[in-house]
A protein has these predicted regions:
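Short, high-confidence coil segments that cap the C-terminus of an alpha-helix
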Residues: 145-147, 342
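Short, conserved alpha-helix that lines the donor NDP-sugar binding/gating region
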Residues: 134, 138
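Hydrophobic pocket-lining residues that define ligand/cofactor binding sites across diverse proteins
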Residues: 140-141, 312
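Short conserved active-site loop signatures built around small residues
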Residues: 130
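Amphipathic alpha-helical interface segments
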Residues: 126
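Conserved "HGTGT" condensation-loop signature of ketosynthase/thiolase-family condensing enzymes
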Residues: 1-118, 158, 167, 171-187, ...
Length: 368
C-alpha cells in the first residue's frame, strides 16, 4: 500500500508569555522569567465555558488562515493531547467529581463547537500527549483512513499539577535553564496550540512530517532510564520510520525540562546517538522553547511544533544562550551553531512515567 505524505499546512499558538498574541515566539524572549507562566489573570480556568474561549482564540484564526468551510471541518478529525484536560474546572471540594469527569469531555465539546468530524481522539500520556496525538494523526492520514487532522495541545493551571511537581521537588525557584550545570528544575506553563495536517500541501504549508516513534520505558514509575538508552532507541526507531540517518538531522528541538534526571537522560541519548566523541563534524545544534514558555506538559508537543513553524516563517531561530560553559551538558551541541541551512528537524518529547516520543519534520519550501 502506497502511503500518503503528511503536511503541516497551518498552525496557531497561544502561550501564556505571549499575552494573548498568537504570532511569534520572539515575543516571549522579551518577557522576564517568572515562577509560573500563567493565563490566570486573563481567563478564569475554573469555569469550563471560559476554558473554551482559549480554543476560540487559537482555532478561529487557524480556520480563517486556511479558509476552511463547514464541509472541510466536517471532514476534519480532532486529536487532542493534554495532561490535566479539564481538571482545572473541577471546583474545590468536589473531589469525587474529579474521578467522574470523562476524559473526552473537551474533545467532544470542541468537535461539536466547530463542526468537526464526530470521530475524535484524546491522548493523555503525560508530557508526550500532544506529540503522540500528532504521531497517530499523521499515521491515519498517511494510510488514507482520514483526510485531515486538527491536532490540539492544551494545558491549564490547576493546583493538583503544581502540588504534584512540588512534592517531587522538581520546580525551580528561579528560572528554567535546561542542560546548564546550575539547573534547578522546571517552571510550569499554560498554553493552547493547534496544527492542521493534510496529505496535500497548501500555500501556507511550512513542514512535512517524515516519521515518528513512541514507546514506554518500564525502568521506573516516574522517569525514564538516566543512561538514555530507551530515549536513544525511540529516536532510532523514529529515524528508521522516517527513512533517514542521524547525519541527516540539521537541528534538534530538545525536550529540555531542566530537571536533573531528565536532562541527563536526554543528553546521554543524544551524545550516544550522534557519537560526539568520535565524529569529525560538529553535531547538529539544538533549540529549546521551555525556557520561554515554561513546561506546558501534555501540550508541549503541539505548542513547540507550532512555535518552530512560526520561527521558520520569520527566519528567526533561538539559540540556547544559557549554555555558556563547557561543563554544561549539551555543550558539544551548542558550539558552532549554524541555523542558515536547516532542512530536517528532530523533535524530542519525554514524559513522566517513561513515555517517550520523537518526531521528524522536514522544512517545506514549496518543492519536494
Amino acid at each position: 500500500m502506497n502511503k500518503r505524505d503528511v503536511y503541516l499546512n497551518a498552525s496557531e499558538v497561544l502561550s501564556a508569555p505571549l499575552s494573548n498574541k498568537t504570532s511569534s515566539v520572539v515575543s516571549t524572549i522579551e518577557d522576564e522569567s517568572v515562577a509560573f507562566k500563567s493565563f490566570r489573570e486573563e481567563i478564569n480556568c475554573s469555569d469550563f465555558t471560559s476554558i473554551l474561549s482559549y480554543f476560540d482564540a487559537v482555532l478561529y484564526p487557524l480556520f480563517k488562515k486556511l479558509n476552511l468551510s463547514a464541509s472541510d471541518l466536517a471532514k476534519t478529525n480532532l486529536f487532542l493531547g493534554s495532561t490535566s484536560l479539564d481538571i482545572s474546572a473541577v471546583k474545590v471540594g468536589d473531589e469525587d467529581k474529579l474521578w467522574l469527569s470523562k476524559t473526552d469531555k473537551i474533545s467532544q465539546a470542541l468537535a461539536k463547537r466547530y463542526g468537526l468530524n464526530e470521530l475524535e481522539f484524546t491522548f493523555s500520556t503525560a508530557c508526550t500527549a500532544s506529540a503522540n496525538a500528532c504521531l497517530y494523526a499523521s499515521r491515519l492520514i498517511s494510510t488514507g483512513k482520514i483526510e485531515h487532522a486538527l491536532v490540539i495541545g492544551c494545558e491549564f493551571y490547576n493546583p493538583l499539577t503544581v502540588e504534584g511537581f512540588k512534592s517531587l521537588d522538581l520546580i525551580s525557584k528561579t528560572e528554567l535553564i535546561a542542560f546548564a550545570k546550575g539547573r534547578s528544575g522546571l517552571i510550569l506553563g499554560e498554553g493552547v496550540a493547534a496544527l492542521y495536517l493534510s496529505s496535500t500541501p497548501t500555500a501556507q504549508c511550512s513542514l512535512k512530517m517524515l516519521g515518528g516513534a513512541s514507546s514506554c520505558d518500564t525502568y521506573s514509575l516516574t522517569m525514564t532510564q538516566e543512561d538514555g538508552s530507551h530515549i536513544a532507541q525511540v529516536i532510532n526507531d523514529c529515524l528508521l520510520q522516517a527513512n533517514i540517518q542521524s547525519t541527516d538531522i540539521d537541528l534538534i528541538k530538545v525536550h529540555g525540562t531542566a530537571t536533573l534526571g531528565n536532562d541527563e537522560a536526554e543528553c546521554n541519548a543524544l551524545t550516544t546517538l550522534f557519537n560526539t566523541s568520535e565524529i569529525t563534524q560538529s553535531p547538529p545544534p539544538i533549540i529549546a522553547f521551555k525556557p520561554f514558555t515554561g513546561h506546558t506538559l501534555g501540550a508541549c508537543g503541539v505548542i513547540e511544533i507550532a512555535l518552530f513553524a512560526d520561527c521558520l516563517s520569520k527566519e528567526s531561530y533561538i539559540p540556547p544562550e544559557y549554555i555558556t560553559q563547557n561543563n554544561d551538558l549539551m555543550w558539544p551541541f551548542y558550539k558552532g551553531n549554524d541555523f542558515s541551512q536547516v532542512n530536517t528537524v528532530l523533535f524530542n518529547y519525554f514524559g513522566f512515567g517513561g513515555n517517550n516520543a520523537a518526531l521528524v519534520f522536514q522544512c517545506y519550501r514549496g518543492t519536494e
